[in-house]
Regions:
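Conserved histidine-centered catalytic loops in small-molecule metabolism enzymes
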Residues: 43-72, 187-207
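Acidic, low-complexity terminal tails and accessory targeting/binding regions
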Residues: 79-88, 132-147, 163-207
Length: 207
């Protein structure tokens, strides 16, 4: 099974360079076009899980009308820095934030906490892929759902998925970049997860 981990398309807050955590703007026109490109890239024979925030739900619905909302895929809580430009984060706080994954921004969430909740989702998805429940009634009896899975989420959860796939800590967050509407691919097998590609934007440059 292949796991597609997708970042939502662009919002106006992204376009303005604001830190965007739990605030809930929808996609802008660019973001909607990006969502269509993502949908074309992953196809429609997939299961789709999404963060509850609008920008992810709108991206997910470009892929499928049948989506499952999972609150654990929500973006990092930036606390009092949500919807503020990075330059407004005091230098000493920014330095500590980057150095320590257990650092909690005022009113917010730590990267350790985020990593734990995202890993829960990924562990469940992997378990279902490797040992799928089987129907015992009707035409579907004995036929597990072996479709690939798409997770539509945000920057920080995608970095947590990267850490999960590589078996490393959340320190990797500050050493990686996740573009809007990018696709990260992770193979799941009995041997565990394997990173196939990270932050691919090839589908966004297609005519």
């Amino acid at each position: 099974m292949t796991l597609y981990v997708v970042r939502h398309g662009r919002t106006q807050a992204n376009a303005k360079g604001l830190l965007l955590g739990r605030a809930d703007p929808g996609l802008d026109d660019v973001g909607r076009r990006q969502a269509s490109s993502v949908a074309a890239a992953v196809g429609n024979e997939v299961r789709v899980l999404s963060s509850p925030l609008r920008r992810c739900v709108e991206t997910a619905r470009a892929i499928s009308d049948d989506i499952v909302i999972d609150d654990r895929l929500i973006e990092l809580d930036y606390g009092e820095f949500d919807l503020r430009p990075l330059k407004e984060v005091p230098a000493e706080i920014w330095s500590q934030w980057r150095a320590d994954p257990s650092f909690r921004p005022p009113g917010g969430e730590t990267l350790i906490e985020l990593g734990a909740r995202v890993a829960e989702v990924l562990d469940v998805v992997m378990e279902q892929a490797l040992h799928p429940p089987q129907s015992d009634v009707g035409a579907d009896a004995g036929s597990p759902d072996d479709r690939d899975v798409v997770l539509v989420t945000h920057v920080s959860p995608i970095k947590a998925a990267l850490a999960w796939a590589l078996g490393v800590g959340m320190e990797v967050s500050w050493r990686s970049f996740v573009a809007q509407a990018s696709i990260t691919r992770i193979a799941v097998s009995e041997r565990g997860p394997s990173l196939l590609s990270f932050n691919s934007e090839a589908h966004l440059s297609s005519p």
